UniProtKB/Swiss-Prot annotation:
Organism: Archaeoglobus fulgidus (strain ATCC 49558 / DSM 4304 / JCM 9628 / NBRC 100126 / VC-16)
Summary of the function given for this chain in its UniProt record: This enzyme is involved in nucleotide metabolism: it produces dUMP, the immediate precursor of thymidine nucleotides and it decreases the intracellular concentration of dUTP so that uracil cannot be incorporated into DNA.
The protein, known as: Probable deoxyuridine 5'-triphosphate nucleotidohydrolase
SUPFAM superfamilies, alphabetized: dUTPase-like
Pfam families: DCD
Organism taxonomic ancestry: Archaea, Methanobacteriati, Methanobacteriota, Archaeoglobi, Archaeoglobales
Gene3D superfamilies in alphabetical order: 2.70.40.10
Alphabetical GO biological process terms: dUMP biosynthetic process; dUTP biosynthetic process
Amino acid sequence: MAVLSGDEIRKLIQKEGLIRDYVDLETQIQPNGFDCTLRSVYRLRGCGRVDFDNSRRELPELEEVEFRDWVYLPKGVYRAKLNEVVRLGNDIMAIARPRSTLIRCGANVLTAVWDAGYEGRSEVSIVVHNDYGIWLSRNARIIQLVFIRLSSPTKGYEGVYKGENIDS
């Protein structure tokens, strides 16, 4: 396994469509990853349910938080949709980490692993810990995706979130 460099990520974007719908490629490519940006934010309006085999999985209802250029988020938990559509081959996975400025402002981003074979416009959770809240601009860079090449190709992700939000 190896973490992909910014140059390798750029080549995969150009040749294989690793990422599309980005805001500014030169700004978003980093030495060891790619910065993903904020498209929309939602308040959770209910309870979720998680089980072993997803047969009784229920996601909370959402209410979109409207914003033009900026949005103020008071302390709490939110779901956010990213601008970028990621398309991973069966030999690449990704892990996301919050950008350090977000952490220094008292907020964090929670994510799952991007499995090999996943394609979609992902959603993440934003947790605002700061008692005074946080202001986020549309297209704010909130996470850095780190891409890891697997030691060998694997069966690609086929779960319910494959293809999510591509048309939205």
